[in-house]
Amino acid sequence: MMQDFHAYPAPAKINLFLHITGRRPDGYHLLQSVFRLLDFGDTVHIRPRADHLIRRTENTPGVPEESDLCIRAATLLQRHSGCKLGADIYVTKRTPMGGGLGGGSSDAASVLLALNQLWHLHLRREELITLGLSLGADVPFFIFGESAWVEGIGEKLQSIQLPQAYYVVITPRIHISTAEIFASKQLTRDTNPTTIAAFLRDLVHNDLETVVRQQHPEVEKCLQWLSRFSKARMSGSGASVFAAFDSQESAEAVLARVNEARELPQFVGCEVSGFCAKGLDQHPLRSFAT
């Protein structure tokens, strides 16, 4: 008898700041950041198979199966572990694609964590993190599974305690090429290393934001609009921007302005989507690895 699909959350993340502190000889940029999980995101659906096949059962628009991070993650884990089982996989998308919110990386991490349990592999967290890094620089954070002070190219992770907060995240419907932003001659690549103490005093920023604001006025407009309610900042390389609020009620009141009025799309110059989310201290699947 065929098993039913199991559903696993794949939470979005935001970068509370992002400094570019240097560049490695291989071209990867060195960074400092704080990553925070949100109680909003995709859902990964997995059904174990007995026949070793790994299949995507529903298409993700714009993502061919061979480059689907979920399929790549499952295949990588299968080869690494020598597991003889397979899986059917599909994703219900909620996290905006190309927003700097880690959607694809989070999906891949949830596949690794879920299959570690479903296939009874009992791989340790550090082993999964190493596998995840080969899929993308953000994947290790989601397997780490806690609010993190991040350094290196994204692989050096240190747990950090953050105050409770609610976030309004808005995303203009535009495409931003992360590669083009990192290749920009205007990008600051030599920001002096900062400290957790400086971050806690908010003496930080997003180095990518200046370049994106210049090249994409829609992001500039979103930041201007959201800053009317609370200090706004871009996540990652955009296009999503966010602001923090002390209460769910305050955040939802701002989100209502996003959803109910034509004012924002007219001001920004394109369609804009938004959501409200509480910051998470831990990934919901963190217990799936030790």
UniProtKB/Swiss-Prot annotation:
Class of the enzyme per the UniProt entry, highest EC level: transferase
Active site: 13, 138
UniProt xrefs under Pfam families: GHMP_kinases_C, GHMP_kinases_N
SUPFAM superfamilies: GHMP Kinase, C-terminal domain, Ribosomal protein S5 domain 2-like
Binding site for ATP: 96-106
EC numbers on record: 2.7.1.148
Signal peptide: none
Keyword hit for Kinase: yes
Pathway, per record: Isoprenoid biosynthesis; isopentenyl diphosphate biosynthesis via DXP pathway; isopentenyl diphosphate from 1-deoxy-D-xylulose 5-phosphate: step 3/6
GO BP terms in the entry: isopentenyl diphosphate biosynthetic process, methylerythritol 4-phosphate pathway; terpenoid biosynthetic process
Alphabetically ordered keywords of this record: ATP-binding, Isoprene biosynthesis, Kinase, Nucleotide-binding, Transferase
Transferase in keyword set: yes
Top-rank taxon, per record: Bacteria
Catalysed conversion reaction: 4-CDP-2-C-methyl-D-erythritol + ATP = 4-CDP-2-C-methyl-D-erythritol 2-phosphate + ADP + H(+)
PANTHER family, sorted: 4-DIPHOSPHOCYTIDYL-2-C-METHYL-D-ERYTHRITOL KINASE, CHLOROPLASTIC (PTHR43527:SF2)
Family: Belongs to the GHMP kinase family. IspE subfamily.
Function: Catalyzes the phosphorylation of the position 2 hydroxy group of 4-diphosphocytidyl-2C-methyl-D-erythritol.
NCBIfam families: ispE (TIGR00154)
Protein name: 4-diphosphocytidyl-2-C-methyl-D-erythritol kinase
